[in-house]
Curated annotation (Swiss-Prot):
The active site is at D14 (proton acceptor), H42 (proton donor). It comes from the Bacteria. The keyword Cell membrane does not apply. Its EC number is 6.3.4.4. The keyword GTP-binding applies. This is Adenylosuccinate synthetase. It is an enzyme of class 6 (ligase). Plays an important role in the de novo pathway of purine nucleotide biosynthesis. Catalyzes the first committed step in the biosynthesis of AMP from IMP. One of its GO terms (cellular component) is cytoplasm. InterPro entries: Adenylosuccin_syn_GTP-bd, Adenylosuccin_syn_Lys_AS, Adenylosuccinate_synth_dom1, Adenylosuccinate_synth_dom2, Adenylosuccinate_synth_dom3, Adenylosuccinate_synthetase, P-loop_NTPase. One of its GO terms (biological process) is 'de novo' AMP biosynthetic process. Mg(2+) binds at D14, G41.
Length: 431
């Protein structure tokens, strides 16, 4: 009987999920994306060669692994085809192994135009969107007016729906945002070109998943972004437009929760965030600059500098509960090498001096909260590339143990560098 494993982020994204998915796919028959779009950026380093994936599951670099894009993913055809071409130029046979659900909502040019126009109009109150049309595409889906991948293969039906959508969205673009209208014929012609290229990769992803399950194959579900960016459970409104938590798996792929055997939560040994929104442990001093420089904290998708801060046990406890995490993977431990003192946030103090140990449920509730820290000794020795727990300095092992105690979940994997081989596996999710 096969095992079905989930890999998802427990912070604000950028936790290092891509590397871990790539590592674990050695045992998987298939890897599935179930939410988000090409706003995700999963970086993989294999034998020193760096690859950044946005839409295609990270299992694509493992020979023979089937890669599936479930119905919960919003697909920008132009971005997907560019990504396919780049991989094929490296000799990866993407079209033979990638399957896409026809129920995926489409991201088209008017979504991108709306996304960027709105963010521009917000000024200083901007959310920090990647400007790639993700939010507007999900809006169309929920409003039941959106075009889906499967519509591409029915020209007349597609053209009629596209005309209605452009009437609606161009009215906003021109009259409210004072931006140029999107051309109907140009958009239609582009989409018909996409249709020819995408058609061979279409599949009923839900049916494929259940066929694999019945055959006893191991399946991996790859989350994008992080739990605190979830549209329902994140720091609203500074969130993404999809369910980044474990609940998104069933709705975004058609694979029910009772079939899942293990949920691996990825967390950095410190905390980062891209864009606007609450960040209680954010550092504006030399330590914050040290973490950013040592950790190469720049977004794989946008190139934006990430905000850096100390490890926050409060938000991680919330993520563990929401996702029913089986075990954690602690990444970027090596970035902390050389710090004399390391701090862990164990609670938040409000204006009245009361200490809160539960994370607030919206962004405004974070206002005025100050982090309560516990200090631990750092270590001067290098942890880079360590392969066993015994290879780590005693202070690093103590830090790992304390994190486990504070969040109430075991750390089953420790990442000590960017390469897939620079990893300590204490308990394998597929074991």
């Amino acid at each position: 009987m096969g095992k079905n494993v989930v890999v998802l982020g427990t912070q604000w994204g950028d936790e290092g999920k891509g590397k871990i998915v790539d590592l674990l796919t050695e045992q998987a028959a298939a890897v599935v994306r179930y939410q988000g779009g090409h706003n995700a950026g999963h970086t993989l380093v294999i034998d020193g060669e760096k690859t950044v994936l946005h839409l295609i599951p990270s299992g694509i670099l493992r020979e023979g692994v089937e890669c599936l894009i479930g119905n919960g993913v919003v697909v920008a055809p132009d971005a997907l085809l560019r990504e396919i071409t780049k991989l094929e130029e490296k000799g990866v046979p993407v079209r033979q192994r990638l399957r896409i659900s026809p129920a995926c909502p489409l991201i088209l040019s008017y979504h991108v135009a709306l996304d960027q126009a709105r963010e521009k109009a917000r000024g200083d109150a901007k959310i920090g969107t990647t400007g790639r049309g993700i939010g507007p595409a999900y809006e169309d889906k929920v409003a039941r007016r959106g075009l889906r991948v499967g519509d591409l293969f029915h020209r007349e039906r597609f053209a009629a729906k596209l005309g209605e959508l452009l009437d609606y969205h161009n009215f906003q673009l021109v009259n409210f945002y004072k931006e140029p209208a999107i051309d109907f014929q140009k958009t239609l012609d582009e989409c018909m070109e996409y249709a020819e290229l995408l058609k061979p990769m279409m599949a009923d992803v839900t049916a494929v998943l259940h066929d694999l399950r019945r055959e006893g194959k191991d399946i991996m579900f790859e989350g994008a972004q992080g739990s605190l960016l979830d549209i329902d459970h994140g720091t609203y409104p500074y969130v993404t437009s999809s369910n980044t938590t474990a609940g998104g798996i069933a709705t975004g792929s058609g694979f029910g929760p009772l079939y899942l055997n293990y949920i691996l939560g990825i967390t950095k040994a410190y905390t980062t965030r891209v864009g606007s929104g609450p960040f209680p442990t954010e550092l504006f001093d030399d330590v914050g600059a040290f973490l950013a420089k040592r950790g190469h904290e720049f977004g794989a998708t946008t190139g934006r500098a990430r905000r850096c801060g100390w490890f926050d046990a409060v938000i991680l406890r919330r993520a563990i509960e929401i996702n029913s995490i089986s075990g954690l993977c602690l990444t970027k431990l090596d970035v902390l090498d050389g710090l004399e003192t390391i701090r862990i946030c164990t609670g938040y103090k409000d204006a009245n001096g009361q200490v809160l140990v539960d994370a607030p449920t919206d962004a405004d509730s974070y206002l005025g909260l100050q982090p309560v820290y516990e200090e631990m000794p750092g270590w001067s020795e290098s942890t880079l590339g360590a392969k066993t727990l015994e290879d780590l300095p005693a202070a690093a092992r103590a830090y790992i143990k304390r994190v486990e105690e504070l969040v109430g979940a075991p750390i089953d994997i420790i990442s000590t560098g960017p390469d897939r081989n620079e990893t300590i596996v204490l308990r394998h999710p597929f074991a």
